[in-house]
């Protein structure tokens, strides 16, 4: 059996983007994170798993309460670096959406996905 812990469609407001105006005014980001554990959760013990609240706290710290960056790729990497510190995590999948990304004309959804696996 494989155990995956997730946080889906967590919407936050933050100031990140390639253009100066994006780093000055908050805009929505929608983050989904899935982490696969190294082994099954055999005990009814929160210490033997990944607390999904920790995923939300990681987003808050790395996306909302951090210095502005230009790329969603950088934000995904920051989340992976943080979550992968948990030795129980074998792999991580992150999807980040930017609903109000500045496209040349209406339509589309800006999305970045990153995956990480422990060596």
Stretch-by-stretch model annotation:
Residues 1-119:
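N-terminal, polar/charged subdomain of small-to-medium soluble alpha/beta proteins
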């Amino acid at each position: 059996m494989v155990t995956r812990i997730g946080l889906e469609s967590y919407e936050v407001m933050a100031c990140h983007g390639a253009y100066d105006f994006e780093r000055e005014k908050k805009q929505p980001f929608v983050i989904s994170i899935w982490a696969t554990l190294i082994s099954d959760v055999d005990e009814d013990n929160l210490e033997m798993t990944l607390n999904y609240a920790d995923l939300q706290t990681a987003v808050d710290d790395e996306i909302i309460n951090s210095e502005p960056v230009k790329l969603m790729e950088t934000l995904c990497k920051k989340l992976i670096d943080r979550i992968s510190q948990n030795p129980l995590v074998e792999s991580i999948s992150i999807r980040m959406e930017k609903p109000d990304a500045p496209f040349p004309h209406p339509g589309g959804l800006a999305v970045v996905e990153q995956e990480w696996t422990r060596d």
